[in-house]
Amino acid sequence: MCYKLWVFCFGIGILFGPLLAEGKLLWEDCVWIGMERNGSLGLEQVRSEIFPILSREKWKQYLPKLGVHYFGIFSKNPEQIDQEYRDVRLQIQQLLYDGGETEREKQKLEIRKLIHSEEKKLLREKIFKSISIAYLSFQKRQLVDSIYQLRSERYKLEQQKRKKEMELGLSSKSESEWRKVWEVEFQSKWIHSESAKKLAILDLYQTMSLDPNVPISLAGGFTERIRLFDPSSDQMIVNENHPLRRKTRLQIELAELEEESLENDWKPKLVLGGYVGKNGNGGFPLQNEIYGLSVGVQANLGGTSFQSNTQNGIQSEGNGIQRIPGYGPQPVGPGENSFQSGSIGLFDDLGRNKKIFDSKMSLLQAKADWKQSEISFFSQVHSIEIKLHELYQKYNLYLESTKSNLNQHRSKREENKQGLISEIEYLKSEEEVFVGLELLLEPYFQYISTALELVLLLGENPFDNRYYRLEPNRFPSDLSKILADWKDLPQNDIRKINEPIQKKPYPFLMEDPYETR
């Protein structure tokens, strides 16, 4: 998916602003805030700005190189005639042929840019996952804590009732002692639940890059916004363009280009040059026009370098000086002048064989990494899928068990009202529902977290996919119905919160225009 940055800014302003004003943050909001504030992601965004600069530099190698050169000689000796010479010329050089090396360098730069793009995507996924896991963990702890709180309120009411029964002698001492043991265990669990909730919100603050003193409030009703699907209903399709897989393929392409560069370094570089200007033996303005052409050849043959230069020029009048590379200035008279120079450096690149060996090893290493990465990727996907099926089955198992416990508890409640069972039996029945709810929440949130991990590997929308979907409006889910029955409240009396009319686009819209998924 590829979107422009203004879509992101527009989405933030329109969709994110009202929720901040209300102080209620949804899952999407937490992800947006965390990704926007993450320092590592911002740093990688700045680093990516170097690639357009380097690309422009590579393009400049196709352009002619212009330069203005000045050369002067002055000699004033008591026993000789004073000499004065000045030379000003405009020089131009154009690369005609380099064996395709410049084009390969451009391709290498483009591949490095794409590799960096995939690394940024992997970083986004890591940040997205860490924020989402922290958010889901807090939602779970919040639900567990609310269940403990409701249980505590009920117990206080029951405690007042039992106190009167004790005063009237209607309750035995053994029942009172059992309730004290139960109360200690319950309070211990509740203390642990409150601590876990505080740690979960701190973890969420950390993943969102927020100061713990910043006041935020998360919207409730999470179980009424998300709809779970059977993971075995659709056949899984592995994402060919996952950033991890694309990165390893691009690294192979880069290693192949590096090897190709070394294999083609024997091809000569051909440079055509020319100059035009004036020189003279007096002061300015200069009198004599000069111009000429030059041809340069460079090559590397098995670690032995070869250079050759040829220049033909014309001196209109007077005497001039030509500067020959490697030989210094030489005087020339009016008319045509030329020079040829050449040099051979025998085995002056002794490390060439090692460079070739290193490039071959880099290519073999890149292919080995790709193969291992593919095996690990498929293994990870299938292992997560197996775990996902297990969690979904556990969730349904605990769901049915909790429904059964809840129905039995309703019967026990009626029997307790009629005095047919003791308070201990009633408390045990309530304890079964209470423990069942805790057991139910564990696979429920684990399923969503595991499905999120798999969705990121498959390249699907993390808010709307084959495993779950965030709905724009609340709906009565199985879990929310059980929680409503547990609270003993009618479904219509559940407090509503403002929901978004439209689901928010997921944060991979923050990708740069050149990045595709």
Segment roles from a protein language model:
Residues 29, 36, 43, 87, ...:
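Residue preference for a single heptad-register face of alpha-helical coiled-coils
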Residues 28-29, 439-517:
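Acidic, low-complexity, intrinsically disordered peripheral segments
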Residues 42, 65-83, 95-125, 246, ...:
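Small/polar (Gly/Ser/Thr/Ala-rich) solvent-exposed segments
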Residues 22-31:
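Regulatory alphaC helix of protein kinase catalytic domains
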Residues 120, 126-246, 251-254, 259-265, ...:
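Periplasmic alpha-helical coiled-coil/stalk elements that build and connect Gram-negative outer-membrane
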Residues 1-5:
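Positively charged n-region of N-terminal signal peptides that target proteins for export
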Residues 6-17:
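Bacterial N-terminal signal peptides
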Residues 89-91, 135, 294-296, 340, ...:
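Membrane-embedded beta-strand positions in outer-membrane beta-barrel channels/transporters
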